[in-house]
């Protein structure tokens, strides 16, 4: 059996190195209501995010519905599987189900078409606890991230990893020195799963482990874009930059945009100008790669944008933290606005029986005037959200106020229904108590003595009529 699975934490108390995250999860679970916000676990792979979610379900005795990257996550499938589960009760009664949606930062491509929008809709309507998991917080859609409470997971410390490896060696009856354990802990870079797998790979067929055995099981650590961009502006050695660019999963055009975004943060204006020249040359190589389909040029483009910009900055660093390309945010905003307008037109077209295209081209201004008279009523009638009302009213604050009014009214109605139900329940309980009291006040019914055994009645003896004796004459 795989040791990573064999020694997976079974309870939240077993999660190592992330005490603050565990406390936040426990507080959320104990006070959870249908109005509670979902949790978003973020952090690098192998530090216990999925294990914490499963342990939470086990500790709270909740059922689990898990949707991860191996599943098809189109809009239709997500709504059919997770959507139905988020609004229904447990299979075994009124218990809760924990819905775990893993790798929400990888919702892209044809396989996940419409998935982010479907998940956002589910988060708004869910009546069950939901946990979302992502390796990269920046990769999560804004429409999802703003609906969740973040729970950051940190890399596990070396001493904590070393202590856990020692426990596993004791359970498996394997001799392992402190130097070997230290090598595993340092090589795993805070990743518990990798550390356990390294220990398993090094101990296969052995009863003791040395440092030499550990060297054959080093972690295949993938560099992040933050490692690469940070190395470029921190003046990392050329060989290290080449290694980071090789290990980074980002494509060269994406890396170029990340580096370009950080160039304005350089201290020296003259160095900034020369750095832009390096980026321009890298862009030329990328263009030739696409036109000629000669992907060998990628290496020259990558070297120009990393080594070239690093040489111009000369390790001077920059003034703030690394940020994703701002153009991505603008593109995302434009795409979001387009999607909101389309969904708004669909809602209005259904309400007024007018084609969506005609709604967008001819009737939005007219409907805006209608909405301005009573925004809350318009919002409630067409079941619109804040973004859709913002397009109608051209005022985000007014849109938020209208939606808040509708939500408050709905909440008051729900509270009223709950109070009426509670009142009826109390009345029924009171009536039952009164009936029970009346039963106690009724005089006891006297017990009837047991009936004596009936004796069979003797039939009256009729007087025997004696027949007259015949006189016997004795003539003789």
Swiss-Prot record:
Answer yes or no on keyword Nuclease.
Answer: no
Question: Which intervals of the chain are annotated as region Disordered?
Answer: 435-476
Biological process according to GO: DNA replication
Q: Which residues bind ATP?
A: 43-50
Which of UniProt's keywords are assigned here?
A: ATP-binding, DNA replication, Nucleotide-binding
Q: Does the keyword Nucleotide-binding apply?
A: yes
Domain of life the protein comes from: Archaea
The GO terms describing molecular function are:
ATP binding; ATP hydrolysis activity; DNA clamp loader activity
The task this protein performs is described as: Part of the RFC clamp loader complex which loads the PCNA sliding clamp onto DNA.
Assembly description: Heteromultimer composed of small subunits (RfcS) and large subunits (RfcL).
UniProt family annotation: Belongs to the activator 1 small subunits family. RfcL subfamily.
- Protein's recorded name: Replication factor C large subunit
Origin species, per record, is Methanocorpusculum labreanum (strain ATCC 43576 / DSM 4855 / Z)
